[in-house]
Amino acid sequence: MAKGHRSKIKRERNEVRDTRPSAKLSYARVSVQKACFVLDAIRGKSVNEALAIVTYNPRYASSLVKKLLESAIANAENNYPEKNYKAENLYVAECFANKGPTMKRIHPRAQGRAYRIEKRMSHITIVLDER
């Protein structure tokens, strides 16, 4: 049933909203499993250390994560002037990849057969916090 006026519901929802700086990349053309290899390497690390890790990581997902991490740092510095975040004090509080849609493709095989190829996508999120 009704839980109150719309403005009251919005006010309550905004009170519990996560206010940590973050960045999200939707529909990244990398599978969740491959993205998690890179994300597991930077989880809990300081921002400068995480940038160094993804810069020299040879995986394809690391270039996507590097751009996303730089975006999260810029979001922290520009979108939260009252908190006055500095890059040297930030660390990767949360980072995860959720499953996105899958593109189905056909690969022709011998004797008129066709195999299905699934090109997987993911939604990658990085949340920073201050130490």
From Swiss-Prot:
PANTHER family: CHLOROPLAST 50S RIBOSOMAL PROTEIN L22-RELATED (PTHR13501), LARGE RIBOSOMAL SUBUNIT PROTEIN UL22M (PTHR13501:SF8). This is Large ribosomal subunit protein uL22. Belongs to the universal ribosomal protein uL22 family. Part of the 50S ribosomal subunit. It comes from the Bacteria. Pfam families: Ribosomal_L22. This protein binds specifically to 23S rRNA; its binding is stimulated by other ribosomal proteins, e.g. L4, L17, and L20. It is important during the early stages of 50S assembly. It makes multiple contacts with different domains of the 23S rRNA in the assembled 50S subunit and ribosome. GO terms for cellular component: cytosolic large ribosomal subunit. Residues 1-20 are annotated as: Disordered. The keyword rRNA-binding applies. Keywords: Ribonucleoprotein, Ribosomal protein, RNA-binding, rRNA-binding. One of its GO terms (biological process) is translation. GO terms for molecular function: rRNA binding; structural constituent of ribosome. Residues 1-11 have a biased composition (Basic residues). InterPro entries: Ribosomal_uL22 (IPR001063), Ribosomal_uL22_bac/chlpt-type (IPR005727), Ribosomal_uL22_bac/org-type (IPR047867), Ribosomal_uL22_CS (IPR018260), Ribosomal_uL22_sf (IPR036394).
